[in-house]
Amino acid sequence: MSEAAMKKVTESKAAIIEKIQMSGRLVVQSPLCIGSGQDDGITDSLVLKNKQGKAFIPGTSLAGVLRDIVCSHDSNLADLLFGNLSDNRQSMINIDDVLLENSVYTVRDGVRIDGITNTAEDTGKFDYEVVERGAAGSFSATITIRKNDIEDKKAVEQLAAALADQLMYGISLGAHTAKGFGEVKGSKIKVATYDFSQPDSLGAWLLGEMSQADIYAAAAKPLVADDDFYAEIDLALKTSLLVGAEPDAFDKGSGKDEWKVQKVMLSSNGDYVIPGTSVKGVIRKQAEHICRVVGDYGDDFLGSLMGYSKADKAKQRSRLRTYEVYLGEGVEAVNQSHVRIDRFTGGHMGSGLYTNKPVWQKKADAKTMTMRLAISGCSDAEAGLMLLILKDIWTGQLAFGGDKAGGSGVMQGLKAVISYKGHKYAMEKAAGGIKVSAEDRAAMNSLVEAFVKAGVRA
């Protein structure tokens, strides 16, 4: 290329002045459900796979999630990096598909519950395929900064670092994210910046080397909005716990039917788990109960928070997000036999003996699990409602899993940290109750009062 032609290229507004390369690994932390829109006649929804039958995360899905995160903080920055159709602004960023390795596929069941009768709806049973946690793949994204964007170069560089930090902290994508699915975290995410005005840096980009690039090693830091609510509560298991799953051949055993195990505790990648769907269901039911007892909140209050899907196709995405709850090594599974009782005679029913295999805590009052929930765009009234529900979980007023009538699924709170509007509230178990500072107690009481006032109608 002649000197004149080179000068013309470098003076063009479309000339590339910098490349930012983001790279690392993404690891699936909870079941991932990115549906293909197809079924196989047995499972209602199958995971998206390539022609070789391997699951992958589309780059478009990652771009959509990251754009939504940025947009919640600064819509102008989101338009700058990801483009805007109305302004004919093209996207600066290109994100590759993430091909998942070591993928294990399982099928999760679901059932639609009638909110009034608390029973399953007719034809409400469904299932879907998921990629179990532990699958991982290589992540790569490239940001191209051109001469006409030179004034925004610094902002884009800072945003790239912030997105890398967010990936290290974790994002949620795919279906059922409000119920704990699709949690993905980055591993060893690096941001390499190549300044094309420097020959060595340009050469390093062309050769795929990082030696001449400005490297940023990302750390786990989320982009959190001021009105986001986040709670993390450490729990011990007071009773048995059984979120039912079909037993394998070993648990089924042989011999008489009544001695065979009918249900075992659900597990995911070797760890016992309370699904986010179960946590969401328990919280929603308790929220409905509290709202009915405390005041007149109408359908809009919980509909805006929990989401809805109506017969007229009107939909609202849930702003409440629950997560899968994984149990540690402090529990063990034990066979537990039951006898069905005839409620008229008080005697046992014929063929009424059955056996399940729930889990029990080995050591009393030791941390067994951590339950998390988050609300985006949370109001004071919604935060107050969540505090009441967290109190019910802490004190064992709410139970999870099956056999609740028999006392199963009861928790005991040990420690909790709640973040809202830039403040952190801390609670710990203490003799005779909950240890919390006077300042935090007053602030949390004001949030509960805001919830009560929201239910007062003129």
Per-range role (PLM):
Residues 1-458:
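Small/polar/charged residue-enriched interaction surfaces, especially the RNA/DNA-contacting tracks
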